[in-house]
């Protein structure tokens, strides 16, 4: 069968054609639900405010294997810089182009195709298969996976293993899987001063001057050494805003946004304590608020990682490398329930970029990997 005609390719194209810029779903979940319903899944839409979610399940017993993913995509950017229209899926030289091709409509299609093939071969499989799909992963992540998990937890419905379809691969399909993620903590700091004329500094109090030594020291602090699973905790200033835009006005306040990506060697509470102690040491007048974006998690050796290793080896012929580097995913909302979480998806070289694309043959291989994982865990 030509690669252009793979079932996974056709479904990926159908999903890309729906311009589901976050938090829109644009019918993607309905398309998936129709396919899953036809093979015995119970479909439960969960709509929270502007976000469309879907919980689909086949089976009533444990263990529960869950495919997790998102139908929303990031904005296209300058459309004139795309080789082809971003929501007109187009195959060129063996690559499928379109917004969401790699992140993550290709993975969603591979999940559905793998499940259809698995159920056809194993209609009486062990346990249950589930899909947790949201349209809020690329946005503020308020009404998406976290709300679905809250609903499941309230009725004591547990996930045993979760496979998130985020584009984990770097150079070739399956060379890297993510078996954990660092925690993420954001600080929003306002350093207060007194606004005034730059010619009369004795009548004002410049918050930028006051904050500069603090920020310099904060940016050079050593937080931890990491461990065998996680790199050392990192700190980055993301935004600094102060002033009126005029050259003759001392600002009355300085706003700073910063972020920690932290290992299991520290906790959010420890980071907060150290930052606020430094603020006090510099005798700053300030307000600060904190946003907890997710706890660090790790899935070590066990059935899920073993099954994934076997699948990638069987389909691609090489060994995978479990890593915890990179950004956050919705896996951070699933892991605290006790589920084992892993991420496996396409090559991530073009995600969020102009001319996002995925290798068509990789989609077929990804579907095969997902199917083997199901066989390893539920047969």
Swiss-Prot record:
Zn(2+) 1 binds at residues 70, 103, 166. It comes from Shewanella baltica (strain OS155 / ATCC BAA-1091). InterPro entries: ArgE/DapE_CS, Bact_exopeptidase_dim_dom, DapE_proteobac, Peptidase_M20, Peptidase_M20_dimer, Peptidase_M20A. The gene is dapE. This is Succinyl-diaminopimelate desuccinylase. PANTHER family: ACETYLORNITHINE DEACETYLASE, N-ACETYL-L-CITRULLINE DEACETYLASE. GO terms for molecular function: acetylornithine deacetylase activity; cobalt ion binding; succinyl-diaminopimelate desuccinylase activity; zinc ion binding. It is an enzyme of class 3 (hydrolase). Belongs to the peptidase M20A family. DapE subfamily. PROSITE patterns: ARGE_DAPE_CPG2_2. Its cofactor is Zn(2+); Co(2+). Pathway: Amino-acid biosynthesis; L-lysine biosynthesis via DAP pathway; LL-2,6-diaminopimelate from (S)-tetrahydrodipicolinate (succinylase route): step 3/3. Keywords: Amino-acid biosynthesis, Cobalt, Diaminopimelate biosynthesis, Hydrolase, Lysine biosynthesis, Metal-binding, Zinc.
């Amino acid at each position: 069968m030509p690669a252009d005609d793979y079932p996974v390719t056709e479904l990926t194209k159908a999903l890309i054609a729906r311009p589901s810029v976050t938090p829109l779903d644009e019918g993607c979940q309905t398309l998936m639900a129709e396919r899953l319903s036809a093979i015995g899944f119970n479909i439960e839409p969960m709509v929270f405010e502007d976000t469309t979610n879907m919980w689909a399940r086949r089976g009533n017993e444990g263990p529960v294997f869950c495919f997790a993913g998102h139908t929303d995509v990031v904005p296209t950017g300058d459309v004139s810089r795309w080789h082809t229209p971003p929501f007109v899926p187009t195959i060129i030289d063996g690559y499928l182009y379109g917004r969401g091709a790699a992140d993550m409509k290709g993975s969603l299609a591979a999940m559905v195709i793998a499940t259809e093939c698995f159920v056809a071969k194993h209609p009486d499989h062990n346990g249950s298969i589930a899909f947790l799909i949201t349209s809020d992963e690329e946005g503020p992540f308020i009404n998406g996976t976290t709300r679905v998990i809250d609903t499941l937890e309230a009725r004591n419905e547990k996930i045993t293993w979760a496979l998130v379809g985020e584009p984990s691969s770097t150079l070739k399909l399956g060379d890297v899987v993510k078996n954990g993620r660092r925690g993420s903590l954001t600080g929003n700091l306002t350093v207060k001063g007194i606004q005034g004329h730059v010619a009369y500094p004795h009548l004002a109090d410049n918050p930028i001057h006051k904050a500069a030594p603090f920020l310099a020291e904060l940016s050079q602090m050593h937080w931890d050494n990491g461990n065998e699973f996680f790199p050392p905790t990192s700190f980055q200033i993301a935004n600094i805003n102060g002033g009126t835009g005029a050259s003759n006005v001392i600002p009355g306040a300085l706003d700073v946004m910063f972020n920690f990506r932290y290992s299991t060697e520290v906790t959010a509470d420890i980071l907060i304590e150290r930052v606020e102690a430094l603020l006090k040491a510099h005798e700053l007048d300030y307000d600060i608020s904190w946003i907890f974006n997710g706890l660090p998690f790790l899935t070590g050796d066990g059935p899920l990682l073993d099954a994934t290793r076997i699948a990638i080896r069987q389909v691609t012929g090489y060994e995978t490398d479990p890593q915890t580097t990179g950004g956050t995913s919705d896996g951070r909302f699933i892991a605290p329930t006790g589920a084992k979480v892993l991420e496996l998806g396409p090559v991530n070289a073009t995600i969020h970029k102009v001319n996002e694309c995925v290798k068509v043959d990789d989609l077929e291989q990804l579907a095969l990997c997902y199917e083997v994982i199901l066989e390893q865990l539920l047969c």
